[in-house]
Amino acid sequence: MDSWVVLLGLQIIWLPLLTHGTAPTPTLRFVAVGDWGGVPNAPFHTAREMANAKEIARTVQTMGADFIMSLGDNFYFTGVHDASDKRFQETFEDVFSDRALRNIPWYVLAGNHDHLGNVSAQIAYSKISKRWNFPSPYYRLRFKIPRTNITVAIFMLDTVMLCGNSDDFASQQPKMPRDLGVARTQLSWLKKQLAAAKEDYVLVAGHYPIWSIAEHGPTRCLVKNLRPLLATYGVTAYLCGHDHNLQYLQDENGVGYVLSGAGNFMDPSVRHQRKVPNGYLRFHYGSEDSLGGFTHVEISPKEMTIIYVEASGKSLFKTSLPRRPRP
C-alpha cells in the first residue's frame, strides 16, 4: 500500500495515501481553504461555506486529495469555547459531510478569529474527530510521494502568536504579539527547521498574508520577519488566508504566495495594490457575486501545480512552481 509519513513534533505516523486511479505520475494532492468558519448564529454556516464544501467534495472525487489544509478563521466570529462546542458539529462536521470527504484528514492552523476564542479547544478536538488534526499551535508535516524518493515538508504556523491579533473586517495591521518570548520561540523554531530542511518541496502556511493587494494588505510583521526566511532557505510557497478572496503572487526569488481566503465571504477590495511590489501579482479574484473558492495543489516529482477553483466549479487560474534543486 502506498503511504505517506507525517511528522508531528517528534512523532512519526505512517498514513495511507489515496490511489489516484491510473494517473501516470505519482503525486501528493491537497485542497487549501481559508476563512471558511460559518457564522455564530443558526444555521451556523453560510451559503458560500456550503457551496465550497460541495465543490471541495466534487474536486476530491475528480482530481483527488490526500488531505485538506485549513488556513485559519475556522469558526467565526469568536472561535469556540471548549472541545465540546456545538460549532464543531454545526460549522465543520455537518457541512463537510459528503461521502467523498468523510475519510480525508484536515490539517488545521488558527486565525485571528480563532484566537478570540479558545484555540486550545481546537487542538483538543483532534482527540475527538478522526478528521481534525491540530496537534499544537505550530507544527511540521512531512510527506513522501508514493513510489518515489520525492519529499514534501509543510510548516504550519500560528501567525497571530507571531504578530498579534487584528480585526478581520477592518484594514488593521496586527497589534504586537501578546507574548514576545513565545513569538521569538516560534520564529526561532521555524528558522532552525528551514535551515535543516532537505525536502524537495518546502511549504510554509499561516493565516496572515505576507503579500496581499486586498483589504488588509501586506502584513508588515511577516514582511519583516518571515519573508527573508523564505528567500534564504529556498521555500517553494507560502499559503495563507485572512483576506477574503483568491490571489496568487510570486516574488523575484521565485517564492509563490498562495492566498486562499474565500471559504465563507468574498471581498472585492484591492485597496493595497500599490503596497505590493510591481510584478508580484499574477492573479486576483474577489467578485462579490461569487460563492467563493479554494485552491487545489498537486505535487509531482517535477513541479507543484496550483489551481484556483471557484465554488461554482469553474477553474479560475493555474500556475506551477518547480521542485527545489537538490544540494
Swiss-Prot record:
Residues 1-22 form the signal peptide. GO terms for biological process: bone morphogenesis; bone resorption; defense response to Gram-positive bacterium; negative regulation of inflammatory response; negative regulation of interleukin-1 beta production; negative regulation of interleukin-12 production; negative regulation of macrophage cytokine production; negative regulation of nitric oxide biosynthetic process. The keyword Iron applies. Its main location: other. Characteristic constituent of osteoclasts. Fe cation 2 binds at D73, N112, H207, H242. Binds 2 iron ions per subunit. It catalyses: a phosphate monoester + H2O = an alcohol + phosphate. Glycans are attached at N118, N149. Its EC number is 3.1.3.2. Keywords: Disulfide bond, Glycoprotein, Hydrolase, Iron, Lysosome, Metal-binding, Signal. Its cofactor is Fe cation. PANTHER family: TARTRATE-RESISTANT ACID PHOSPHATASE TYPE 5. Exists either as monomer or, after proteolytic processing, as a dimer of two chains linked by disulfide bond(s). May play a role in the process of bone resorption. The osteoclastic trap acts on nucleotide tri- and diphosphates with higher affinity, compared with other substrates. This is Tartrate-resistant acid phosphatase type 5. It comes from Mus musculus (Mouse). The lineage of its organism: Eukaryota, Metazoa, Chordata, Craniata, Vertebrata. The gene is Acp5.
